[in-house]
């Protein structure tokens, strides 16, 4: 007996028509399918696409998401990665305003497409600037000759997004996505855990979620002044307390008070 999660992983790694179809290739296939559905659609955001869906779908044929954290582009002396969690603000309230199942379904689909679109804005930037990135990162080739991207999505669904990337560009990548979401009408908050590649992933993810929640607390405090986007980050290393509050109490507090915005 195996769980359905294990079954899906095994299916994703099996040969298909003599060609290995790993999970990262399926991720790219999903993105390409969404890009095809976006092609020719009217765009209602405050700014037009910064990319052409058909061209990006074609360009992605030459690239692959790394399946190992060590292949995100880190150098030996800078072996840090980042776990990024981004979440839309007040989405529950927005869905409650949809008083029929049809409206909720349409809104859910619209939010999903906007989330994918924002991620594709970043991918287009990365591909367009790939030669420059290679000067600062160690970006390898996959066995099939495709070039590894310095990022890998973990969750892309609804207003929720989690990805891993090289630490050097974590803030820039997150800013690009949050600005794209904002242009698409979704203000959001984000949390970034910066950690050694060998650091336990689940701990980094938990802290990234807590950082996003801390950013949302600031957003809610400023709510009367209108919508806003907030980002919080932390650098993790060695043995540290299990919660963000404990980490900051231990490392970012002094006799004169705290040394962070929280």
Residue ranges, per PLM feature:
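Regulatory and interdomain segments flanking nucleotide-handling catalytic cores
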Residues: 1-262
């Amino acid at each position: 007996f195996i769980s359905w999660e294990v079954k899906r992983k095994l299916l994703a790694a099996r040969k298909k028509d003599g060609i290995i179809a790993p999970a990262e290739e399926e991720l790219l296939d999903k993105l390409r399918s969404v890009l095809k559905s976006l092609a020719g659609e009217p765009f209602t955001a405050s700014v037009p696409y910064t990319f052409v869906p058909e061209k990006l779908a074609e360009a992605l044929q030459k690239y692959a998401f790394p399946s190992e954290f060590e292949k995100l582009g880190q150098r030996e002396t800078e072996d840090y990665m980042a776990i990024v969690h981004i979440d839309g603000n007040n989405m529950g309230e927005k869905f409650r305003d949809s008083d029929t199942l049809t409206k909720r379904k349409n809104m859910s689909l619209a939010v999903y497409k906007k989330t994918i679109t924002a991620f594709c804005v970043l991918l287009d930037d990365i591909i367009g600037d790939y030669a420059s990135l290679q000067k600062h990162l160690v970006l390898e080739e996959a066995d099939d000759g495709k070039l590894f991207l310095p990022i890998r999505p973990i969750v892309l669904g609804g207003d929720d997004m989690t990805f891993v990337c090289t630490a050097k560009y974590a803030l820039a990548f997150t800013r690009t996505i949050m600005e794209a979401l904002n242009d698409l009408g979704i203000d959001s908050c984000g949390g970034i855990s910066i950690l050694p590649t060998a650091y336990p992933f689940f701990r980094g993810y938990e802290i990234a979620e807590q950082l996003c929640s801390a950013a949302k607390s600031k957003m809610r405090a400023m709510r009367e002044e209108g919508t806003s986007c907030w980002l919080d980050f932390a650098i993790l290393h060695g043995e540290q307390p299990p919660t963000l509050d404990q980490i900051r109490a231990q490392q970012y507090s002094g006799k004169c008070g705290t040394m962070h915005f929280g």
